UniProtKB/Swiss-Prot annotation:
Signal peptide annotation: 1-17
Family note: Belongs to the LDLR family.
Gene: Lrp10
Principal location class: membrane
Cytoplasmic topological domain: 463-713
PROSITE patterns per UniProt: CUB, LDLRA_1, LDLRA_2
Modified residues (Phosphothreonine): 596
The protein's name: Low-density lipoprotein receptor-related protein 10
Length: 713
């Protein structure tokens, strides 16, 4: 454990030794090209490329304007030329392939710069890698050249030769032969320090800017800008070439003895950039400090009072140089900024009336560029809808269209996206100074979640109620009945239809069997049945001599009674009942004839032909061997039987036949008729009425007769 601590400190020391390096993980080679929008930065070969088997292809894109130059300086570049390559490409130059460090910095003008590092892989040799720094700045001129204010470079011999070689007159400004005699001459660049400039505009530069002169000791210079006007001053540094350790500071106010207020500090990181500083008052102090043996040229700057333009510039607005811009020193524009596709004026004066576009339209790019042929209307600018291919209509927006919000980076987004919890501007300025508010996504998720929870709650309540109802129903089966429920459940059933007819509650229906509610015996049921049969067999009934069609069940019952011999068959002549010799006594036909007319309710009569039905057979016990001799001695028929009512005999016969048919096993043979002397005693019908009316059953197989066939309705 102790031996690992020194190694840990060494690793931390190595990581902190170069904190300015920007390292890229291995994923930078596998993802899409990395876009670098910073003004300056550092690049090195991606770490983690220790594996020599797999190839690599890493790409970085440095965003830049077409009027800027990207300067690349190599601190280290050692690649294996056969297997590793570093390619730099810009729109205005052919690709540059490197495997060794160049002699000096590379200047790549024209806009975006693409840097590509490739490795062949397959265990090919690898170099030590590369380390470079880049910066976006204006094009720097050589030491023997003069840099114009419009960033052009001309030979130093063309300075103050009476010819406008720069195109903006900056090479002739401050000379004895000023091309603008009607204007106050601008002071010529001077090598003196600690000067006070009191004009409304002017040009000043550091000592040795026009010619490089290194000194062996540090230098310090001050310039006091006091045009004696209360309006603000705009100080613009058109060229910067500072060495390491050199610095330029801009203060607000007149300086000592007053405490100055620092507005801006410029170092070698600002080299090649055009920097504009606006004061808070009508005075400013510019200080310049160099180190010994400084290799930097210094700076070149101009100043003017807000509301005025330099003689070689044009005003953005109408009138005496007053423009509509609210930015620093941009109420004027130079000839080089005319029709370049970038709005330097807030109202687009520098891009209005350019060749190739109709009146009221603005070009997407400068002449000679791919976007120069496309033109757009003012309504298409700064509305968060890109019209130009390179997005020139959405850059440097001073004002946005209605319904849009202007970001601090001079871009526009929809106004509804402001303070919604999600940054839409590049710098996130649309979420600054916002009161606490939940994002739309959180609110939407909360609403959807609440709806889902409410739906689940309703389903849960429905299931709970259903289960409770089922459980309550199960418990109610075993629960005792209440008095009210018992009264409802135990109510007496309503009377039947036949009982209502018998009680006289409703009128009787023809051919419907009535019953006495107080007579539920078998005898009463048989009487009702015989009444139906009597009505059916009565000639000339209520139907006017025509027999009514009976129900199927009644017709079947009548056929069975006829088959059993309980009813006479129709259209059959009456015959005397056959008597069993020496066994069954017969009833004389005269007695039956006499009793036919006296038949009361419940008797059976013949059909329409008026024939008399045969008497019912009398059931006698089966003779036994002990009774055979006694019966054999009887040679004469018994005397006449006593007069028995036909109804009683018929009912008795029906009951006996039903009992013999349905209950053969329960019937014990015995004498039905008892002889006392010369006559037979018949059992009382009341003794045979105490039977149950059981459903008709057919334990035996009956022979189907012709009468069993169903009648046609």
């Amino acid at each position: 454990m102790l031996s690992a601590l020194p190694l840990l400190f060494l690793l931390l020391g190595g990581a902190l030794a170069r904190p300015d390096r920007i390292t890229f993980p291995r994923s930078a080679c596998e993802a899409p090209p990395a876009v670098l929008s910073e003004v300056q930065g550092t690049l090195q070969r991606p770490l983690g490329r220790d594996s020599r088997s797999s190839p690599a292809n890493c790409t970085w894109v440095i965003l830049g304007s077409k009027d800027q130059t990207v300067t690349v300086r190599f601190q280290k570049l050692h690649l294996a030329c056969g297997s590793e390559h570093l390619i730099l490409h810009s729109p205005l130059q052919p690709p540059i392939s490197l495997c060794e460090a160049p002699s000096g910095p590379l200047q790549l003008p024209g806009g975006n710069v693409t840097i590509t590092y490739s490795y062949a892989g397959a265990r090919a040799p690898m170099g030590q890698g590369f380390l470079l720094t880049y910066s976006q700045d204006w094009l720097l001129c050589l030491q023997e050249e003069f840099q114009c204010l419009n960033h052009r470079c001309i030979p130093a011999a063309q300075r103050c030769d009476g010819i406008d070689a720069c195109g903006d007159g900056s090479d002739e400004a401050g000379c004895s032969s000023d091309p603008f005699p009607n204007l106050n001459p601008a002071p010529a660049p001077t090598l003196a320090c600690n000067l006070t400039l009191e004009d409304f505009y002017g040009v000043f530069s550091s000592p040795g800017y026009s010619h490089l002169a290194s000194v062996s000791h540090p230098q310090s210079c001050l310039w006091l800008l006091d045009p004696h006007d209360g309006r603000r001053l705009a100080v613009r540094f058109t060229a910067l070439d500072l060495s390491y350790g050199d610095a330029v500071h801009v203060y607000d106010g007149a300086g000592p003895p007053e405490t100055p207020r620092l507005l801006r500090s410029l170092t070698h990181f600002s080299n090649g950039k055009a920097v504009t500083v606006e004061t808070l008052s009508g005075q400013a102090v510019v200080s310049y400090h160099t180190v010994a043996w400084s290799s930097g040229r210094g700076f070149n700057a101009t100043y003017h009072v807000r509301g005025y333009c330099l003689p070689w510039d044009r005003p953005c607005g109408l009138g005496s140089g007053l423009g509509a811009s609210e930015n620093l020193g941009e109420r004027c524009y130079s000839e080089a900024q005319r029709c370049d596709g970038s709005w330097d004026c807030a109202d687009g004066t520098d891009e209005e009336g350019c060749p190739g576009c109709p009146p009221g339209h603005f070009p997407c790019g400068a002449a000679g560029t791919p976007g120069a042929t496309a033109c757009y209307l003012p309504a298409d600018r700064c509305n968060y809808q890109t019209f130009c291919a390179d997005g020139a209509d959405e850059r440097r927006c001073r004002h946005c269209q209605p319904g849009n919000f202007r970001c601090r980076d001079e871009k526009c987004v929809y106004e509804t996206w402001v303070c919604d919890g999600q940054p839409d501007c590049t710098d996130g300025s649309d979420e600054w100074d916002c009161s606490y508010a939940l994002p739309r996504k959180v609110i939407t998720a909360a609403v959807i979640g609440s709806l889902v929870c409410g739906l689940l709650l309703v389903i849960a309540l429905g299931c709970t109620c259903k289960l409770y109802a089922i459980r309550t129903q199960e418990y109610s089966i075993f629960a005792p009945l209440s008095r009210m429920e018992a009264e409802i459940v135990q109510q007496q059933a309503p009377p039947s239809y036949g009982q209502l007819i018998a009680q006289g509650a409703i009128p009787p229906v023809e051919d419907f069997p009535t019953e006495n509610p107080n007579d539920n015996s078998v005898l009463g049921n048989l009487r009702s049945l015989l009444q139906i049969l009597r009505q059916d067999m009565t000639p000339g009934g209520t139907s006017g001599g025509r027999r009514r069609q009976r129900g199927r069940s009644i017709r079947r019952l009548v056929r069975r009674l006829r088959r059993w011999g309980l009813l006479p068959r129709t259209n059959t002549p009456a015959r005397a009942p056959e008597t069993r010799s020496q066994v069954t006594p017969s009833v004389p036909s005269e007695a039956l004839d006499d009793s036919t007319g006296q038949a009361c309710e419940g008797g059976a009569v013949g059909g329409q032909d008026g024939e008399q039905a045969p008497p019912l057979p009398i059931k006698t016990p089966i003779p036994t061997p002990s009774t055979l001799p006694a019966l054999a001695t009887v040679s004469e028929p018994p005397g006449p039987l006593p007069s028995v009512p036909v109804e009683s005999s018929l009912l008795s016969g029906v009951v006996q036949v039903l009992r013999g048919r349905l209950l053969p096993s329960l019937w014990s043979p015995g004498p039905t008729w008892t002889q006392t002397g010369t006559h037979t005693t018949v059992l009382s019908p009341e003794d045979e009425d105490d039977v149950l009316l059981l459903p008709l059953a057919e334990p035996e197989v009956w022979v189907v007769e012709a009468e069993d066939e169903p009648l046609l309705a």
